Amino acid sequence: MAKKMAKTNAVRLIEQQNISYEVLGYKTDGQPVDGISVAEKIGYSLKYVYKTLVAAAGTNHYYVFVVPVAEELDVKKAAKVTGEKKIEMIAMKELLAVTGYLRGGCSPIGMKKLFPTYIDASAETLDFIIVSAGKIGMQLKLAPQDLARSCDAAFAEIV
């Protein structure tokens, strides 16, 4: 009998919002993994798998960006959509304290606070995207519009 995965905060929140989703799991030793290897482990094309990045403008002014795993956040475009002059990625050591999530398991859903969130516009035309479910080894497959609704996100050109 297969072992049932424990629900994360991200899963609980989307269930409360009656959002359709699928949990995808993969074997892990608990160490952080990169998004490209996650796509390979779950057997999906890179175009569907997105990573969650957290950036800051000054002190305690955080933004969340959801971008394809094979792409990089364009910080100039990101600053423009946020209305900030400059944003920078937060240090890895700050991630847990700011979001409540570890590197490799950071979900745009269910962070400690609801930060302004932007999903790359490339996701809008897809039937589904895959993001972290809030822990290493667990991903969520859901419609991009449902992801946006779940974390009050906007779509924007950010890569």
UniProtKB/Swiss-Prot annotation:
Q: What is this protein called?
A: Putative Cys-tRNA(Pro)/Cys-tRNA(Cys) deacylase YjdI
* Keyword annotations from UniProtKB, A to Z: Lyase, Protein biosynthesis
Keyword Lyase on entry: yes
Which InterPro entries does the UniProt record give? Answer: Prolyl-tRNA_editing_YbaK/EbsC, YbaK/aa-tRNA-synt-asso_dom_sf, YbaK/aa-tRNA-synth-assoc-dom
Q: Which Pfam family is one of those matched by this entry? A: tRNA_edit
Q: What class of enzyme is it?
A: lyase
Keyword Protein biosynthesis: yes or no? yes
Q: Which BP terms does GO give this entry?
A: translation
| Family in the record | Belongs to the prolyl-tRNA editing family. YbaK/EbsC subfamily.
NCBIfam families per record: YbaK_EbsC
Q: Which CDD domains match?
A: YbaK_deacylase (cd00002)
E.C. number(s) listed in UniProt: 4.2.-.-
GO MF annotation, one: aminoacyl-tRNA deacylase activity
